[in-house]
């Protein structure tokens, strides 16, 4: 009985330790197809290598939140870091700016990464 209690305690302590590790997310913003002004496309925000799993992702057009954003299911890598894809339909123009803003416990303030149409 004492062995079982000790084993359960060690497992719980190990799991708690997993949440103590924080990894800062890596953020990539890119379009599905090469951009053409006035032609509908898909804008992706791929967020990887973060821990713990709780994360907030917003996609922005000219600094304002885009309301219709879809999210993939969150998944994890072999190192227990997480990744997720946010995406939305958009029609690029010469003057509009697009970005992805990510808020995570590992960062003091949200990070915004802008879409570079030349990438």
Swiss-Prot record:
Oxidoreductase is among the record's keywords: no
Residue pairs linked by disulfide bridges in the UniProt entry: 45-100
Residue intervals of the Ig-like C1-type domain: 25-114
InterPro entries cross-referenced by the UniProt entry: B2Microglobulin, Ig-like_dom, Ig-like_dom_sf, Ig-like_fold, Ig/MHC_CS, Ig_C1-set, MHC/Immunoglobulin
The UniProt record lists the keyword Disulfide bond: yes
Chief place of localization: secreted
Family matches, as CDD domains: IgC1_beta2m (cd05770)
GO cellular component terms attached to this protein's record: cytosol; external side of plasma membrane; extracellular space; Golgi apparatus; HFE-transferrin receptor complex; MHC class I peptide loading complex; MHC class I protein complex; phagocytic vesicle membrane
Compartments in which it is found: Secreted
Family annotation (Gene3D superfamilies): Immunoglobulins
Signal sequence region: 1-20
Keywords associated with the record: Disulfide bond, Immunity, Immunoglobulin domain, MHC I, Secreted, Signal
GO molecular function annotations of the record: protein homodimerization activity; structural molecule activity
GO biological process, one term: protein refolding
PANTHER family: BETA-2-MICROGLOBULIN (PTHR19944:SF62), MHC CLASS II-RELATED (PTHR19944)
Family named by the database record: Belongs to the beta-2-microglobulin family.
Subunit-level organization: Heterodimer of an alpha chain and a beta chain. Beta-2-microglobulin is the beta-chain of major histocompatibility complex class I molecules. Forms a heterotrimer with MR1 and a metabolite antigen.
Function according to Swiss-Prot or TrEMBL: Component of the class I major histocompatibility complex (MHC). Involved in the presentation of peptide antigens to the immune system.
The protein, known as: Beta-2-microglobulin
Lineage start: Eukaryota, Metazoa, Chordata, Craniata, Vertebrata
